[in-house]
Curated annotation (Swiss-Prot):
The record marks 344-345 as: Cleavage. Its main location: plastid. GO terms for molecular function: chlorophyll binding; electron transporter, transferring electrons within the cyclic electron transport pathway of photosynthesis activity; iron ion binding; oxidoreductase activity, acting on diphenols and related substances as donors, oxygen as acceptor; oxygen evolving activity. The lineage of its organism: Eukaryota, Viridiplantae, Streptophyta, Embryophyta, Tracheophyta. PSII is composed of 1 copy each of membrane proteins PsbA, PsbB, PsbC, PsbD, PsbE, PsbF, PsbH, PsbI, PsbJ, PsbK, PsbL, PsbM, PsbT, PsbX, PsbY, PsbZ, Psb30/Ycf12, at least 3 peripheral proteins of the oxygen-evolving complex and a large number of cofactors. It forms dimeric complexes. A quinone binds at residues 215, 264-265. This is Photosystem II protein D1. Chlorophyll a ChlzD1 binds at residue 118. Fe cation binds at residues 215, 272. The gene is psbA. The modification Phosphothreonine is found at residue 2. Photosystem II (PSII) is a light-driven water:plastoquinone oxidoreductase that uses light energy to abstract electrons from H(2)O, generating O(2) and a proton gradient subsequently used for ATP formation. It consists of a core antenna complex that captures photons, and an electron transfer chain that converts photonic excitation into a charge separation. The D1/D2 (PsbA/PsbD) reaction center heterodimer binds P680, the primary electron donor of PSII as well as several subsequent electron acceptors.
């Protein structure tokens, strides 16, 4: 009898816990994805803050020349970064217990791998949590689908690219200047500006910004008049009021006359689907481009593609970009390589010829 009562009590405790986790009445929805999201994101955030402030220099290139990234080692907010895991570690899973000491783990850039893996798991769970809450509220799943674009981009930069290049040391440093350094090196090694998927991503981001600004300005400008013709339309409203003032018919008419009739939407759902889909699809393509360039399927190469009747090269913008790429590659890992890979791989007989 005692055992039966204990089993019922424990079952009720578990049931209450499940109900609390999945309740949509909580101020912040937790959900089963949140059970994993909360500790992973807290871990990633905590280690990032500590490492950004106090992590010792990291031997990123695996050549016993550590690079300092933390504030206590001479950096500021702009130059500081979490330095990627050493090339000596490569793609090995490198938790603290795999190193002989904490000092060795820090020297080899262990915090970077810890932060990145916990962060990616956390943001993936956040996406799952969005779907879970939508499901419990009877909504459609497109919020999570839209969020999959930045999740895919982060996964491409922090996981797929290092896998393709063979080392976490090729991942993006976690800092402002580190991000720009990663972009410059990526251009030098993969010619990303000439990759069509990157072009689609640029169109998605800048186009999304343009459409967002156009939509916001139209909504705030299309007022349902509550004043007489002799008064300003603004007099009937106050900034930030909750009541809707938007008239989609007026906005449609304005925009149709500004450009042409079929450039505007007269259906609110179609309009907002377009506003969501344009940047999401663009960023999906960018993530796909990063993932293909990770395995060295690079941007278009039009170097020395225009010649005259005598076979002499007529330089184009592509040749200027190629020269800039070589210059950036020379500056990158200057102590690890004598020449850029493009120059080091030239056949000797072609030089002699």
């Amino acid at each position: 009898m005692t055992a039966i009562l204990e089993r019922r009590e424990s079952a009720s405790v578990w049931g209450r816990f499940c109900n609390w986790i999945t309740s949509t009445e909580n101020r912040l929805y937790i959900g089963w994805f949140g059970v994993l999201m909360i500790p992973t994101l807290l871990t990633a955030t905590s280690v990032f803050i500590i490492a950004f402030i106090a992590a010792p220099p990291v031997d990123i290139d695996g050549i016993r020349e550590p690079v300092a990234g933390s504030l206590l080692y001479g950096n500021n907010i702009i130059s500081g970064a979490i330095i990627p895991t050493s090339a000596a570690i490569g793609l090995h899973f490198y938790p603290i217990w795999e190193a002989s000491s904490v000092d060795e783990w820090l020297y080899n850039g262990g915090p970077y791998e810890l932060i990145v893996l916990h962060f990616l798991l956390g943001v993936a769970c956040y996406m799952g949590r969005e779907w879970e809450l939508s499901f419990r509220l009877g909504m459609r799943p497109w919020i999570a689908v839209a969020y999959s674009a930045p999740v895919a981009a982060a996964t491409a930069v922090f996981l797929i690219y290092p896998i393709g290049q063979g080392s976490f040391s090729d991942g993006m440093p976690l800092g402002i200047s580190g991000t720009f350094n990663f972009m410059i090196v990526f251009q030098a090694e993969h010619n990303i500006l000439m990759h069509p998927f990157h072009m689609l991503g640029v169109a998605g981001v800048f186009g999304g910004s343009l459409f967002s600004a156009m939509h916001g300005s139209l909504v705030t400008s299309s007022l349902i008049r509550e004043t007489t013709e002799s008064e300003s339309a603004n007099a009937g409203y106050k900034f930030g009021q909750e009541e809707e003032t938007y008239n989609i018919v007026a906005a449609h008419g304005y925009f149709g006359r500004l450009i042409f009739q079929y450039a505007s939407f007269n259906n609110s759902r179609s309009l907002h689907f377009f506003l969501a889909a344009w940047p999401v699809v663009g960023i999906w393509f960018t993530a796909l481009g990063i993932s293909t360039m990770a395995f060295n399927l690079n941007g278009f190469n039009f170097n020395q593609s225009v010649v005259d009747s005598q076979g002499r090269v007529i330089n184009t913008w592509a040749d200027i970009i190629n020269r800039a790429n070589l210059g950036m590659e020379v500056m990158h890992e200057r102590n690890a390589h004598n020449f850029p890979l493009d120059l080091a791989s030239v056949e000797l007989d072609s030089i002699d010829g």
